[in-house]
């Protein structure tokens, strides 16, 4: 595969070492990662989730620099350029989107390989997924960990950034907040979602600019039925709402190794789960 052809998340994931042994979402993914020095891994046989796959340690700076033929400094400069030059993604019809190849008949987020990494954690967490929210002509795209509290119920840790503002504003108006939860988006989307801005910038437009700069091709998105736009080639696209309810979230071992406290945080209700064939 040529560098210009390596665009989707699965293009990168399938370049990893493949683990074919049955691996459990309950501590098994983390144990296997540790045993492999936290190198890039693709798990092809998830005990609790037949037909679904999982990956870890894929999109490192070293990997992206190699695939994109950029030095670390050039990668930072490219990201800075995209911030300064956001552009619109291209909207395509849902039937042309890989993420719409399958829709769960009954929503059950426990049937996809969401891991329980550390024994101290409250349970299974989506910690590498992106939330996209749209309200009153504004959009936010950012990372937030989400505790799996039921088949269609999550509790999200919302720190005081822009998605928290969107949520508080919707609640002040006695409204729900329409969102999408994305797993396995391409690196341009994930990098943009990880950026931090003081002002309420549309990170999806930054992702579109980065995608055009890196690949020379526009970022394709679709519009879900709740009005939220998502990357067309994402592995999973969940249509959801942030409700007016709060519930317990945590404890959780965060990126620093510190066990984060229990807090009351917003509840997310998942209404639909779309995914690619043999999703990662």
Feature annotation, model-predicted:
Residues 1-252, 257-267, 271-280:
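Extended, highly charged
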């Amino acid at each position: 595969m040529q560098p210009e052809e390596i665009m989707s998340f699965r293009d990168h994931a399938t370049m990893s070492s493949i683990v074919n042994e049955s691996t459990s979402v309950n501590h098994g993914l983390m144990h296997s990662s540790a045993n492999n020095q936290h190198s890039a891994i693709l798990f092809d046989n998830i005990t609790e989730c037949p037909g679904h796959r999982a990956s870890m340690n894929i999109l490192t700076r070293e990997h992206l620099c190699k695939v994109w033929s950029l030095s670390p400094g050039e990668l930072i400069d490219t990201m800075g350029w995209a911030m300064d030059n956001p552009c619109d993604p291209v909207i395509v019809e849902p039937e042309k989107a890989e993420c719409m190849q399958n829709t769960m008949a009954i929503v059950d987020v426990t049937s996809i390989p969401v891991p329980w990494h550390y024994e101290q954690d409250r349970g299974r967490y989506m910690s590498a997924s992106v939330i996209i929210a749209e309200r009153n002509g504004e959009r936010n795209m950012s990372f937030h960990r989400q505790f799996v509290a039921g088949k269609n119920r999550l509790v999200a840790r919302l720190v005081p950034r822009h998605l928290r503002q969107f949520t508080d504003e919707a609640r002040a108006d006695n409204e729900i907040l329409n969102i999408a939860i994305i797993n396995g988006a391409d690196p341009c989307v994930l990098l943009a979602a990880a950026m931090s801005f003081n002002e309420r910038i549309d990170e999806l437009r930054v992702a579109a600019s980065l995608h055009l700069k890196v690949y020379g091709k526009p970022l394709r998105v679709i519009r879900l039925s709740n009005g939220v736009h998502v990357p067309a080639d994402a592995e999973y696209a969940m249509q959801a709402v942030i409700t007016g309810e709060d519930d317990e979230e945590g404890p959780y071992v965060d990126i620093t190794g510190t066990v984060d406290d229990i807090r009351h945080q917003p509840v997310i209700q998942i209404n639909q789960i779309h995914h690619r064939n043999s999703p990662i």
